[in-house]
Amino acid sequence: MTAKTEEILESLKSLSLLEASELVKQIEEAFGVSAAASAGVVMAAPGAAGGDGDGGAAEEKTEFDVILESFDAAAKIKVLKVVRNATGLGLGDAKALVESAPKTVKEGIAKADAETLKKEIEEAGGKVTLK
């Protein structure tokens, strides 16, 4: 890491949550990007709470857990492949997760990501719930 990037990193570490939120907004405007798309839940939660006013965040959940409830025995390998791709687990760990259903596949992910993963697992032959 260069001295310049280290200095910037140290400056960022000293920011309060409010200052960090303002910085993110300024970066989004300056570069025409959205932090919510790349950072997922971490950046989406403060934005949702600020945009809805008081009580808005409590009405709609922003983080979801994807839970594999069961799977069709004939589709075990397909479900296993989807779980491995989604979690980055090794073959043995993914197999243990799938075989111990009901089991949480991913925790605290954005609604869109959770729904996408649910659809992929269901298409492979698994039964999934979002909590």
UniProtKB/Swiss-Prot annotation:
GO terms for cellular component: cytosolic large ribosomal subunit. CDD domains: Ribosomal_L7_L12. Transmembrane segments: none annotated. Keywords: Ribonucleoprotein, Ribosomal protein. Disulfide bonds: none annotated. GO terms for biological process: translation. SUPFAM superfamilies: ClpS-like, Ribosomal protein L7/12, oligomerisation (N-terminal) domain. GO terms for molecular function: mRNA binding; structural constituent of ribosome. InterPro entries: Ribosomal_bL12 (IPR000206), Ribosomal_bL12_C (IPR013823), Ribosomal_bL12_C/ClpS-like (IPR014719), Ribosomal_bL12_oligo (IPR008932), Ribosomal_bL12_oligo_N_sf (IPR036235). Belongs to the bacterial ribosomal protein bL12 family. NCBIfam families: L12. Forms part of the ribosomal stalk which helps the ribosome interact with GTP-bound translation factors. Is thus essential for accurate translation. Homodimer. Part of the ribosomal stalk of the 50S ribosomal subunit. Forms a multimeric L10(L12)X complex, where L10 forms an elongated spine to which 2 to 4 L12 dimers bind in a sequential fashion. Binds GTP-bound translation factors. This is Large ribosomal subunit protein bL12. The gene is rplL.
